[in-house]
Amino acid sequence: MARTHIPGFPRIGAQRELKFAQESFWRGESGEPHLRGVARELRARHWQLQQDAGLDFVTVGDFAYYDQMLNLSALLGALPQRFGFEPKTLSLAEYYELARGNAAQPAMEMTKWFDTNYHYLVPELGPQTSFDGGVEWLFEEIDEALALNLPVKPVLIGPITYLWLSKSHVAGFDRLSLLPKLVIRYARLLDKLRQSGIEWVQLDEPALCVDLPAEWLDAFSAAYEVLGTSGVKVLLATYFESAAEHAPRVAALPVAGVHLDLVRAPQQLDAWRAALPAHAVLSAGVIDGRNIWRADLGEIVESLQSLQAEFGERLWIAPSCSLLHVPVSLDAEKKLDADLKSWLAFATEKLAEVATLALALRDPAAAEPALAATDRALEARRRSSAVVNALVQKRVAAVSSAMAERQSPFAERNRLQREALGLPLLPTTTIGSFPQTAAIRQARAAYKRGELRALDYLQRMRTEIEIAVRKQEELGLDVLVHGEAERNDMVEYFGEQLWGYAFTENGWVQSYGSRCVKPPIIYGDVYRPEPMTVETTRYAQSLTQRLMKGMLTGPVTMLQWSFVRDDQPRSTTALQLALAIRDEVVDLEKAGIRIIQIDEPAFREGLPLRRADWAAYLEWATRAFRISAAGVADQTQIHTHMCYSEFNDILPSIAAMDADVITIETSRSAMELLDGFGAFAYPNEIGPGVYDIHSPRVPGADAMQRLLERACEVIPAERLWVNPDCGLKTRGWPETEAALANMVRAAKALRAKLAARQADELTA
């Protein structure tokens, strides 16, 4: 009989209870006992959902107060030494300082979790890292679950993935040299789990699904030779891609089972069936853990029947990966179109799908009603007239190569733009959004509830726009933005105005820490029926003589940060989005807007995990961006923004996007991203972020000037812009104004310094 489990469950709560408890704690409105109490209630609720669904295991260890990698660093005792915290007595206040920074130290670096929109905190390791152990919150959670008489399966990120995703700031240091000490700590953790009565532990090694060097693979084997004999059974979990080439290696190790992502990489199954020894468990990840579409259970049952015949009780059924990446439940969706809702499955519904698959193998007749309901919903989706739009299909078919090219090369455009825009050396700007105050959020909520008339809402938003414009003028910024007061989310705002999109009331997903996003659903062909931002941007420009940027979200980010239809290639959906955004760019230019920013912070996260698959993605992704941007005259300056992106290895494709100006996140990584731009001789203009907006810490003007001077060593000052790392939506006005004042001060000081140097050279 097949067994059932999940790799992980969303931690935020169906009503974002964790987010609100975190933020209350940060504001000092509640203490650690309240936060711990909310966390305990959420864990118990989520375990009960798994138990009620009939799963054979409940997963423990997927909860984190901020991030699972930070939790693991705390458990291992591998905290950044610069904070001076004692790992074994780490408080929640100190834990959050690691994530958010404090007056003395900037936050730990944050970056994307593989190719998802979740962010993790990058471990900081070095020769001094000892892995002597730290706070054992995991064991407290296991005790909670055992006290509820639940069948516990703990989950930990595995040692190879932990090291692979870490960084060292010590030149020449090999992180892999830490593995022997790290394995000793893991072995002790597994032994403690054994003593707690745990039978199975899930060790997540998604790093096996990327292009690991040979020495890392050898290190993996050495590590699991030890960990596989710890006395607790190890389920080695891979996900997000195929790990087929490692099947013989894993089969030779003393691991008790392997979990495979058979949604993203169904082709790997044959290799694993051939390699796995007779005792090994195969956990089949057959329910999509990263998208929200209802699974074709009938088709999956057919594929599982042969696996059951081969593996029997050694077959486990699961989602492809942790359900962290999907919303908690459809129960709260009262306004969603009934047909569309019937096509969906969120985390709680996916628990039922897993259980139904196991039931269908065990008792086909008992599962028949559920399977029949699924078949009806999927057939209705296939036949729906809401999915295919003939107008969009015709336009996509008419796209030409010329639509992806600007009128002139960058050098000529740049000359014309300098003449037209008249900007100083090192022009200052921001990335787009300004603080979303309580007044803004309350007005938007009242408007959505029907308690505020459209005209009154428009006037309130215009008041906020004027406030933002006046503050920017007072600060002395060169290129202004309208502040995006009217926007709840950079994707949702546009999706609400496009055909082919749908929106949930409560479909929240954790992005990082307390930051939750509510991805829209692309269910059909995408089309822009009317302008989306033109009137707002035109109004903002009317308030000032300075240049006002139009602010749009690019096609790749619209795609990456949505739940995307799975019935056509993602490249086709990206092209539809590009055409919609192209129309908006052209209309902004007609309205007199001379600088238009098309944000693509998610560009790199769309990369396949395997380098061999990159070229195809980069071709259609860069083409989509160019199509969105190329409909304007040479004098119109196109900006793009990328944050949390490590893209030195795809710089040719970044250059191929042909944006006139790119702004990037660099402050947390001390401008190291710029080294690649310099070595590549990136031809266009660039704005390296000079301060980290994700921390409340206000950096001084001197610190920002030093970063700019470092940037000038790599990129000529004539091609540099000065800006924060990212938008300022989540910050408060006092810290925002203080930081921007220092940023402008730094830019002016460096301008003066460079001018003086130039004068000295002329007189020498």
UniProtKB/Swiss-Prot annotation:
Q: Provide the alphabetized UniProt keywords.
A: Amino-acid biosynthesis, Metal-binding, Methionine biosynthesis, Methyltransferase, Repeat, Transferase, Zinc
EC? 2.1.1.14
This entry's comment on the bound cofactor is: Binds 1 zinc ion per subunit.
Tell me, in a sentence or two, what this protein's role is: Catalyzes the transfer of a methyl group from 5-methyltetrahydrofolate to homocysteine resulting in methionine formation.
Q: Which organism is it from?
A: Paraburkholderia xenovorans (strain LB400)
Q: Which family does it belong to?
A: Belongs to the vitamin-B12 independent methionine synthase family.
Under the heading InterPro entries, the entry gives: Cbl-indep_Met_Synth_N (IPR013215), Cobalamin-indep_Met_synthase (IPR006276), Met_Synth_C/arc (IPR002629), UROD/MetE-like_sf (IPR038071)
Which sites bind L-methionine? 431-433, 484, 599
Pathway note: Amino-acid biosynthesis; L-methionine biosynthesis via de novo pathway; L-methionine from L-homocysteine (MetE route): step 1/1
Q: Transmembrane residues, as ranges?
A: none
A Pfam match is Meth_synt_1
Cite the binding residues for Zn(2+): 641, 643, 665, 726
Catalytic reactions on record? 5-methyltetrahydropteroyltri-L-glutamate + L-homocysteine = tetrahydropteroyltri-L-glutamate + L-methionine
This one is known as 5-methyltetrahydropteroyltriglutamate--homocysteine methyltransferase
Instruction: Identify the gene encoding this protein.
Output: metE
Active site residues according to the UniProt entry: 694
